[in-house]
Curated annotation (Swiss-Prot):
The gene is ispE. This is 4-diphosphocytidyl-2-C-methyl-D-erythritol kinase. Keywords: ATP-binding, Isoprene biosynthesis, Kinase, Nucleotide-binding, Transferase. ATP binds at residues 99-109. Pfam families: GHMP_kinases_C, GHMP_kinases_N.
Length: 314
Protein backbone atom coordinates (compact mmCIF):
# COMPACT_ATOMS: atom_id res chain seq x y z
CA UNK A 1 0.00 0.00 0.00
CA UNK A 2 1.30 3.48 -0.88
CA UNK A 3 -0.53 5.31 1.90
CA UNK A 4 -1.52 4.75 5.52
CA UNK A 5 -3.72 6.58 8.03
CA UNK A 6 -2.72 6.18 11.66
CA UNK A 7 -4.11 7.10 15.06
CA UNK A 8 -1.48 8.70 17.32
CA UNK A 9 -2.65 8.82 20.98
CA UNK A 10 -1.39 11.33 23.50
CA UNK A 11 0.04 10.35 26.88
CA UNK A 12 -0.01 11.44 30.47
CA UNK A 13 2.36 10.62 33.32
CA UNK A 14 0.87 8.87 36.33
CA UNK A 15 4.23 9.04 38.09
CA UNK A 16 7.39 11.08 37.44
CA UNK A 17 10.36 10.90 39.79
CA UNK A 18 13.65 12.66 39.08
CA UNK A 19 16.44 10.47 40.46
CA UNK A 20 19.55 12.38 39.41
CA UNK A 21 21.82 13.51 36.58
CA UNK A 22 23.07 11.35 33.73
CA UNK A 23 26.50 11.68 32.06
CA UNK A 24 24.75 12.71 28.79
CA UNK A 25 23.22 15.80 30.45
CA UNK A 26 19.71 14.36 30.68
CA UNK A 27 18.00 13.41 33.94
CA UNK A 28 17.74 9.89 35.31
CA UNK A 29 13.99 9.30 35.63
CA UNK A 30 11.47 6.74 36.84
CA UNK A 31 8.02 7.25 35.32
CA UNK A 32 4.71 5.53 34.78
CA UNK A 33 3.37 6.47 31.36
CA UNK A 34 -0.21 6.07 30.15
CA UNK A 35 -1.74 6.41 26.66
CA UNK A 36 -5.03 8.29 26.37
CA UNK A 37 -7.72 8.33 23.69
CA UNK A 38 -7.14 12.02 22.85
CA UNK A 39 -5.25 11.43 19.60
CA UNK A 40 -3.95 13.03 16.41
CA UNK A 41 -4.59 11.47 13.01
CA UNK A 42 -1.60 11.07 10.68
CA UNK A 43 -1.84 10.29 6.97
CA UNK A 44 1.34 9.18 5.17
CA UNK A 45 1.64 8.67 1.43
CA UNK A 46 4.33 8.24 -1.21
CA UNK A 47 4.76 11.20 -3.56
CA UNK A 48 7.31 9.92 -6.08
CA UNK A 49 10.01 12.58 -5.79
CA UNK A 50 12.65 12.12 -3.08
CA UNK A 51 11.51 14.78 -0.64
CA UNK A 52 9.66 15.07 2.69
CA UNK A 53 6.55 17.24 2.91
CA UNK A 54 4.68 17.94 6.17
CA UNK A 55 1.21 19.48 6.23
CA UNK A 56 -0.88 20.27 9.30
CA UNK A 57 -4.30 21.78 9.94
CA UNK A 58 -2.89 23.73 12.92
CA UNK A 59 -1.17 26.97 11.83
CA UNK A 60 1.43 26.90 14.63
CA UNK A 61 2.77 23.42 13.84
CA UNK A 62 6.09 23.76 11.93
CA UNK A 63 6.21 22.04 8.54
CA UNK A 64 9.98 21.61 8.26
CA UNK A 65 12.91 20.15 10.21
CA UNK A 66 11.59 21.88 13.37
CA UNK A 67 8.77 19.31 13.34
CA UNK A 68 9.77 16.02 15.00
CA UNK A 69 7.52 14.12 12.53
CA UNK A 70 9.65 15.56 9.70
CA UNK A 71 12.80 14.47 11.55
CA UNK A 72 11.34 10.97 11.94
CA UNK A 73 10.87 10.69 8.16
CA UNK A 74 14.34 12.14 7.59
CA UNK A 75 15.86 9.57 9.99
CA UNK A 76 14.11 6.72 8.16
CA UNK A 77 15.28 8.02 4.77
CA UNK A 78 18.89 8.08 6.03
CA UNK A 79 18.64 4.65 7.69
CA UNK A 80 17.08 3.05 4.60
CA UNK A 81 18.33 5.14 1.63
CA UNK A 82 17.76 2.41 -0.98
CA UNK A 83 14.15 1.93 0.11
CA UNK A 84 13.62 5.71 0.18
CA UNK A 85 14.99 5.92 -3.38
CA UNK A 86 12.73 3.07 -4.51
CA UNK A 87 9.51 4.33 -2.93
CA UNK A 88 10.20 8.04 -3.42
CA UNK A 89 9.32 10.91 -1.11
CA UNK A 90 6.81 11.10 1.69
CA UNK A 91 3.91 13.44 2.38
CA UNK A 92 2.83 13.55 6.03
CA UNK A 93 -0.52 15.16 6.87
CA UNK A 94 -1.21 15.82 10.55
CA UNK A 95 -4.73 16.42 11.84
CA UNK A 96 -4.11 17.93 15.27
CA UNK A 97 -6.41 17.15 18.20
CA UNK A 98 -3.82 16.94 20.99
CA UNK A 99 -3.07 20.48 22.24
CA UNK A 100 0.43 21.77 21.51
CA UNK A 101 3.12 22.28 24.16
CA UNK A 102 0.86 20.66 26.71
CA UNK A 103 2.96 17.89 28.27
CA UNK A 104 0.87 15.29 26.40
CA UNK A 105 3.56 14.08 23.94
CA UNK A 106 1.75 15.50 20.89
CA UNK A 107 4.96 15.84 18.87
CA UNK A 108 6.44 12.54 20.05
CA UNK A 109 3.33 10.57 19.12
CA UNK A 110 3.36 12.14 15.63
CA UNK A 111 6.99 11.02 15.20
CA UNK A 112 6.07 7.53 16.44
CA UNK A 113 3.26 7.36 13.86
CA UNK A 114 5.68 8.31 11.06
CA UNK A 115 8.11 5.55 12.09
CA UNK A 116 5.32 2.95 12.23
CA UNK A 117 3.71 4.22 9.01
CA UNK A 118 6.94 4.16 7.00
CA UNK A 119 7.79 0.70 8.33
CA UNK A 120 4.44 -0.48 6.95
CA UNK A 121 4.54 1.50 3.71
CA UNK A 122 8.12 0.54 2.88
CA UNK A 123 7.53 -3.07 3.99
CA UNK A 124 10.62 -2.99 6.21
CA UNK A 125 9.34 -5.52 8.74
CA UNK A 126 11.07 -3.81 11.68
CA UNK A 127 10.53 -5.29 15.12
CA UNK A 128 8.88 -3.33 17.92
CA UNK A 129 12.28 -3.00 19.61
CA UNK A 130 13.96 -1.74 16.40
CA UNK A 131 11.26 0.91 15.99
CA UNK A 132 11.70 1.96 19.63
CA UNK A 133 15.48 2.23 19.20
CA UNK A 134 14.95 4.55 16.22
CA UNK A 135 12.40 6.50 18.25
CA UNK A 136 14.85 6.97 21.14
CA UNK A 137 17.14 8.86 18.73
CA UNK A 138 14.35 11.40 18.16
CA UNK A 139 13.06 11.95 21.69
CA UNK A 140 12.57 10.31 25.08
CA UNK A 141 8.78 9.89 24.73
CA UNK A 142 8.80 8.46 21.19
CA UNK A 143 9.58 4.81 22.15
CA UNK A 144 6.63 4.76 24.58
CA UNK A 145 4.27 6.34 22.05
CA UNK A 146 4.95 3.52 19.56
CA UNK A 147 3.53 0.76 21.78
CA UNK A 148 1.59 2.82 24.30
CA UNK A 149 -0.69 1.33 26.93
CA UNK A 150 0.61 1.51 30.50
CA UNK A 151 4.37 1.23 31.08
CA UNK A 152 7.17 1.97 33.49
CA UNK A 153 9.80 4.17 31.83
CA UNK A 154 13.32 4.52 33.22
CA UNK A 155 16.65 6.18 32.28
CA UNK A 156 15.46 9.08 30.04
CA UNK A 157 12.07 7.34 29.85
CA UNK A 158 13.08 5.28 26.81
CA UNK A 159 13.72 1.99 28.68
CA UNK A 160 10.23 0.54 28.98
CA UNK A 161 8.65 -2.24 31.04
CA UNK A 162 5.00 -2.93 30.09
CA UNK A 163 2.43 -2.90 32.90
CA UNK A 164 -1.12 -4.32 32.92
CA UNK A 165 -3.60 -2.10 31.07
CA UNK A 166 -5.77 0.16 33.19
CA UNK A 167 -9.23 -0.10 31.62
CA UNK A 168 -12.31 1.94 32.48
CA UNK A 169 -10.47 5.00 33.77
CA UNK A 170 -11.54 8.36 32.37
CA UNK A 171 -9.44 11.49 32.41
CA UNK A 172 -10.50 15.14 32.41
CA UNK A 173 -7.76 17.36 30.98
CA UNK A 174 -7.53 21.12 31.33
CA UNK A 175 -5.05 23.55 29.82
CA UNK A 176 -4.76 27.32 29.68
CA UNK A 177 -4.80 28.22 25.99
CA UNK A 178 -2.00 30.77 26.17
CA UNK A 179 0.22 29.07 28.73
CA UNK A 180 3.12 26.85 27.80
CA UNK A 181 5.97 25.62 30.00
CA UNK A 182 9.37 24.91 28.49
CA UNK A 183 10.48 21.36 29.33
CA UNK A 184 14.19 22.41 29.51
CA UNK A 185 13.18 25.27 31.87
CA UNK A 186 11.26 22.88 34.15
CA UNK A 187 14.14 20.39 34.46
CA UNK A 188 16.79 23.13 34.76
CA UNK A 189 14.83 24.89 37.50
CA UNK A 190 14.29 21.60 39.31
CA UNK A 191 18.05 20.94 39.15
CA UNK A 192 18.78 24.42 40.58
CA UNK A 193 16.33 23.94 43.46
CA UNK A 194 16.70 20.25 44.25
CA UNK A 195 20.03 19.22 42.71
CA UNK A 196 21.40 18.63 46.22
CA UNK A 197 19.05 15.62 46.53
CA UNK A 198 20.29 14.00 43.28
CA UNK A 199 21.76 10.52 43.32
CA UNK A 200 24.78 10.33 41.01
CA UNK A 201 26.43 6.93 41.43
CA UNK A 202 25.18 4.22 39.07
CA UNK A 203 24.41 1.57 41.69
CA UNK A 204 22.29 3.94 43.80
CA UNK A 205 20.42 5.10 40.68
CA UNK A 206 19.76 1.46 39.82
CA UNK A 207 18.37 0.71 43.29
CA UNK A 208 16.15 3.84 43.04
CA UNK A 209 14.74 2.58 39.73
CA UNK A 210 14.12 -0.84 41.28
CA UNK A 211 12.40 0.81 44.25
CA UNK A 212 9.85 2.39 41.89
CA UNK A 213 9.54 -0.88 39.93
CA UNK A 214 8.53 -2.75 43.09
CA UNK A 215 6.83 0.25 44.70
CA UNK A 216 3.21 1.03 45.62
CA UNK A 217 2.20 2.70 42.32
CA UNK A 218 3.21 -0.30 40.20
CA UNK A 219 1.54 -2.64 42.74
CA UNK A 220 -1.69 -0.61 42.56
CA UNK A 221 -1.65 -0.85 38.74
CA UNK A 222 -1.00 -4.61 38.80
CA UNK A 223 -3.88 -5.06 41.27
CA UNK A 224 -6.16 -2.70 39.27
CA UNK A 225 -6.71 -0.70 42.44
CA UNK A 226 -7.90 2.51 40.75
CA UNK A 227 -8.50 4.36 44.02
CA UNK A 228 -4.89 3.77 45.05
CA UNK A 229 -3.57 4.70 41.59
CA UNK A 230 -5.33 8.05 41.99
CA UNK A 231 -3.93 8.59 45.49
CA UNK A 232 -0.37 7.73 44.39
CA UNK A 233 -0.16 10.15 41.44
CA UNK A 234 3.22 11.90 41.73
CA UNK A 235 5.14 14.40 39.60
CA UNK A 236 8.36 16.01 40.87
CA UNK A 237 8.05 18.79 38.28
CA UNK A 238 4.97 20.13 40.07
CA UNK A 239 7.41 21.43 42.72
CA UNK A 240 8.71 24.04 40.26
CA UNK A 241 5.67 24.60 38.01
CA UNK A 242 3.00 25.19 40.67
CA UNK A 243 5.07 27.82 42.51
CA UNK A 244 5.89 29.62 39.25
CA UNK A 245 2.34 29.47 37.86
CA UNK A 246 -0.20 29.97 40.69
CA UNK A 247 -3.12 29.53 38.26
CA UNK A 248 -2.05 25.88 37.86
CA UNK A 249 -2.16 25.37 41.63
CA UNK A 250 -5.63 26.92 41.69
CA UNK A 251 -6.74 24.58 38.88
CA UNK A 252 -5.28 21.57 40.70
CA UNK A 253 -7.15 22.54 43.88
CA UNK A 254 -10.39 22.93 41.90
CA UNK A 255 -10.03 19.38 40.52
CA UNK A 256 -9.06 18.00 43.97
CA UNK A 257 -12.26 19.40 45.51
CA UNK A 258 -14.39 17.28 43.15
CA UNK A 259 -15.27 13.57 43.18
CA UNK A 260 -12.04 12.39 41.49
CA UNK A 261 -9.64 9.48 42.01
CA UNK A 262 -6.72 11.92 41.89
CA UNK A 263 -5.36 14.97 40.08
CA UNK A 264 -1.91 16.03 38.84
CA UNK A 265 0.02 17.97 36.20
CA UNK A 266 1.19 15.86 33.25
CA UNK A 267 4.91 15.86 32.42
CA UNK A 268 6.39 19.35 32.45
CA UNK A 269 2.87 20.77 32.04
CA UNK A 270 0.94 22.89 31.80
CA UNK A 271 -1.94 20.39 31.33
CA UNK A 272 -3.64 19.40 34.58
CA UNK A 273 -5.70 16.22 34.66
CA UNK A 274 -8.09 14.41 36.99
CA UNK A 275 -9.01 10.72 36.94
CA UNK A 276 -12.56 9.37 37.31
CA UNK A 277 -14.17 5.93 37.11
CA UNK A 278 -16.89 6.83 34.59
CA UNK A 279 -17.61 9.16 31.70
CA UNK A 280 -20.59 10.69 33.52
CA UNK A 281 -18.34 11.50 36.50
CA UNK A 282 -15.78 13.02 34.12
CA UNK A 283 -18.47 15.23 32.56
CA UNK A 284 -19.69 16.35 36.00
CA UNK A 285 -16.12 17.19 37.08
CA UNK A 286 -15.47 19.15 33.87
CA UNK A 287 -18.70 21.15 34.29
CA UNK A 288 -18.01 21.91 37.97
CA UNK A 289 -14.37 22.96 37.46
CA UNK A 290 -15.25 25.00 34.37
CA UNK A 291 -17.88 26.89 36.39
CA UNK A 292 -15.58 27.28 39.41
CA UNK A 293 -12.62 28.61 37.40
CA UNK A 294 -14.77 30.74 35.06
CA UNK A 295 -11.84 31.44 32.74
CA UNK A 296 -12.42 31.66 28.96
CA UNK A 297 -8.72 30.85 28.42
CA UNK A 298 -9.17 27.40 29.99
CA UNK A 299 -9.83 24.49 27.61
CA UNK A 300 -11.13 21.05 28.63
CA UNK A 301 -11.08 17.57 27.11
CA UNK A 302 -12.42 14.21 28.27
CA UNK A 303 -10.53 11.08 27.29
CA UNK A 304 -10.20 7.46 28.31
CA UNK A 305 -7.10 5.39 29.07
CA UNK A 306 -5.87 3.67 25.91
CA UNK A 307 -4.42 0.15 25.92
CA UNK A 308 -2.22 0.68 22.86
CA UNK A 309 -0.06 3.22 21.05
CA UNK A 310 0.05 3.83 17.30
CA UNK A 311 -2.67 2.00 15.37
CA UNK A 312 -3.98 1.94 11.80
CA UNK A 313 -7.13 4.05 11.36
CA UNK A 314 -10.10 2.07 10.06
Amino acid sequence: MRSYSLIAPGKINLYLEIIGDRPDGYHELAMVLQSISLADKIHIRSIGIETIVVRCDHPLVPQDVDNIAYRAASLMSKEFPEVFARYGGVEITINKYIPMAAGLAGGSTNAAAVLVGLDLMWELGLTHRELQELGARLGSDVPFCIGGGTALGTRRGEILSPLPNLDHIYVVLAKYKNLSISTPWAYKTYRQKFGHTYISDTESQKSSRQRVHSGPMVSAIVEHNYKEVGELLHNDLEKVALSEYPQLLKLREAFASENVLGTMMSGSGPTMFALTESQSQAEEVRAAVKEKMADPDLEFWIAQFNSSGISIAH
